[in-house]
Curated annotation (Swiss-Prot):
[4Fe-4S] cluster binds at C66, C157, C288. It catalyses: isopentenyl diphosphate + 2 oxidized [2Fe-2S]-[ferredoxin] + H2O = (2E)-4-hydroxy-3-methylbut-2-enyl diphosphate + 2 reduced [2Fe-2S]-[ferredoxin] + 2 H(+); dimethylallyl diphosphate + 2 oxidized [2Fe-2S]-[ferredoxin] + H2O = (2E)-4-hydroxy-3-methylbut-2-enyl diphosphate + 2 reduced [2Fe-2S]-[ferredoxin] + 2 H(+). InterPro entries: LytB/IspH (IPR003451). This is 4-hydroxy-3-methylbut-2-enyl diphosphate reductase. (2E)-4-hydroxy-3-methylbut-2-enyl diphosphate binds at H96, H185, T250, S317, S318, N319, S379. It is an enzyme of class 1 (oxidoreductase). It comes from the Bacteria. Pathway: Isoprenoid biosynthesis; dimethylallyl diphosphate biosynthesis; dimethylallyl diphosphate from (2E)-4-hydroxy-3-methylbutenyl diphosphate: step 1/1; Isoprenoid biosynthesis; isopentenyl diphosphate biosynthesis via DXP pathway; isopentenyl diphosphate from 1-deoxy-D-xylulose 5-phosphate: step 6/6. Pfam families: LYTB. It comes from Trichormus variabilis (strain ATCC 29413 / PCC 7937).
Amino acid sequence: MDTKTFKRTLQHSENYNRKGFGHQAEVATQLQSEYQSSLIQEIRDRNYTLQRGDVTIRLAQAFGFCWGVERAVAMAYETRKHFPTERIWITNEIIHNPSVNQRMQEMQVGFIPVEAGNKDFSVVGNNDVVILPAFGASVQEMQLLSEKGCKIVDTTCPWVSKVWNTVEKHKKGDHTSIIHGKYKHEETIATSSFAGKYLIVLNLKEAQYVADYILHGRNREEFLQKFAKACSAGFDPDKDLERVGIANQTTMLKGETEQIGKLFEHTMLQKYGPVELNQHFQSFNTICDATQERQDAMLELVQENLDLMIVIGGFNSSNTTQLQQISQERGLPSYHIDVVERIKSVNSIEHRQLNGELVTTENWLPAGKIVVGVTSGASTPDKVVEDVIEKIFALKATTAVV
């Protein structure tokens, strides 16, 4: 399929909308009421610091809802307002936040059911409205919905669309797209659907394995087995790694994406020399500004004298996981939670580890005066952050009285 032509045709269709429906002002008031927080604004105004009793909260200077997420949520609310009686679906979670997705269900916005790992689009009627989430949808899903005659509301973040344009350029130049991301993540699935040949690497270690294969060759069968679920159909590492371009899932660690880009640039330079480098390597800046800002703010925050770190965001939120990784690499006691209810008591907190395991830690909140660092992922409303901070204040106040 000519994905570029298909996308252009879809965007000119009368059933396609990516600009909203003119209800922005009304929806903005509703979103402010449901998701914003006067406490969080107070902390911002106090140089991102608030002290109550024995607790000092230090808030990262960039956290929470990014522009792309705000836009996606606002468009979903607008869609419900514009189509008050129609059936509305979302191809996946609108964003990776449980409270926001619960709100979608309360608004009678349905999620496409998944059977045995596959989405069941048979539930979608020809006249239904379908929202594409902030991290996009695959070309195949868009084509299916277009053929059904559905009204498509596209909330894909422009930064994600920028990555799609990048892999289109790779394809035009007959370059294989090496995508830094998680092959199961919805954004990477969407991005790879726009690519020609592609290979998805999770981290620098996997990238180094590929670079070594390019330079020295390795066991071909081992390579194909290692990346069986992370490459395009019919991928041939002996042919398809002669010309490569770099792209990324926008929520990955900025520094690691940059390292991977430099690694492959050096690899192709070493193999083909400076004269032919541009024929064999392409790189465009596809690092999301919001992701970069939140990671940079986290790197600054963990340099402070903190007793512990709270990272708030959906457990399937990649950008939140990266924030947690930064904290743990610093050696801080750090707890990734998605909702305030994970904090059971002064003595018990349920949290997600980097390996995905949900564990309970006892005696997590130190006695006496403490400084708590707080940040949140790009899909986390300020109201959720407020709930967590108030819970910590309340727990410490109770122990102080006792």
